[in-house]
Amino acid sequence: MASDEQSKEGRASATIAVHGGEHREQPFGAVVSPVYHSSSFGFQTFDELRRYARGELSDAYFYSRYANPTVSEVERKIAELEGGESAVVTSSGSAATFCALAALCESGDEIIACESSYGGTVKILTELLSRFQITARFISIEEIARLPEIRSERTRLFWFESPANPINRLVDLDMAARAARAARVFSIIDSTFATPVLQRPLSFGIDAVMHSATKYFGGHSDLTAGVVVGTEDYIDKVRHMASRVGATLDPAAAYLLGRGLKTLAMRVRASCENSLQLARALTRNKMVARVYYPGLEDDPDYKLARRQMNGFGGGVVAIDLAGGEPEAERFFDALRIVKCAPSLGGVETLVSYPLYSSHVGFSDEQLRAAGVSAATIRFAVGIEDASDIINDVEQALAKTGQTD
């Protein structure tokens, strides 16, 4: 959704990020919502307990593994940001992924997923869910339109990312939603790289949205969290799964998440603007063989990004170095400001080597499908001054061709 586009309630995403989900009347007139650290909640009478047990007090709190007021507030905020009926936050993005998938699948079911998926997701599909006889089949982005003929009688879900980690391949959301509906399968997107500031997949017809809230939602690299957004009926199933496996979010982390969300719109825009400047600089650098960034006019997904990502290319830039691991090592070791670390979406610029991070342990075939090689480097661009980021990257690149 455009950053100034209004929600059904008439509020723009930047306003929802600040005020969404919050109760206007707080105890003692507090401007900031309190943090409810309590692990359990009492009842005034035995009759209240009985009514809660019978499901007659849906807004009551009982035990924080099931629900907590601080957690509920951030869930309402994220649901409104995505334009969904309901949301559930979890202890990590991986927990959100597992619960989103397991909530609808049973033994014998099949999940079709894009082969350009985050490494952790691939391992959940192939190493964890497979233990419950839930199988995964991987297809290319180009094959999504053929979902109705690709699916089997066992296919229950379709999972994909857009933009995809790490080289920013985009999926046409309208096409994917139509293909999933025609195939009669439930569609879930990992929209972590985009955030609802850039795109709202539910408005295109995608059934559910997952985010690693550790990233842009938190925005300060100081928490781990995940979230799933969709219809009330579906989210009830995901919430039930999360509470049963203990994947719910701690209220202290929920408070940090809510605080981070308040600056989401401005942080995402700043990151996108810096990313475009960095990507343009990298295209002119002789030590860079290729730049992957859909905000560049010569990128194959540029027009799609203009259409469905509010005209931005996102906050992640990937490159292929003119070289391999030895050149990558010299580059990483020469950086002075940019930090070598996994993750993304924080205020600081990070650089990672997918071969040894998000896609470690992948087979050569899997790496080719994901577009990852020994030359691939991913930048998660922060909100520092763009010239400082570029200067640091360029001085480090200048040393990749040097030998001792």
Predicted regions span which residues?
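N-terminal glycine-rich, Lys/His-bearing helix-loop that initiates the first secondary-structure elements
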Residues: 1-58, 404
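Glycine-rich beta-alpha junction loops
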Residues: 22, 37-44, 193-195, 215, ...
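Conserved N-terminal alpha-helix of the aminotransferase class I/II PLP-enzyme fold
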Residues: 40, 45-95, 120-127
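Acidic-histidine catalytic/liganding microenvironments
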Residues: 81, 282-286, 335
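Conserved C-terminal alpha-helix-loop-beta "cap" of PLP-dependent enzymes
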Residues: 287-377, 381
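Short amphipathic alpha-helical segments
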Residues: 59, 85, 224, 253, ...
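Conserved PLP-enzyme active-site core in the AAT-like
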Residues: 4-10, 17-23, 86-287, 292
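PLP-dependent enzyme catalytic core of the Aspartate aminotransferase-like
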Residues: 2-3, 126-127, 135-137, 156, ...
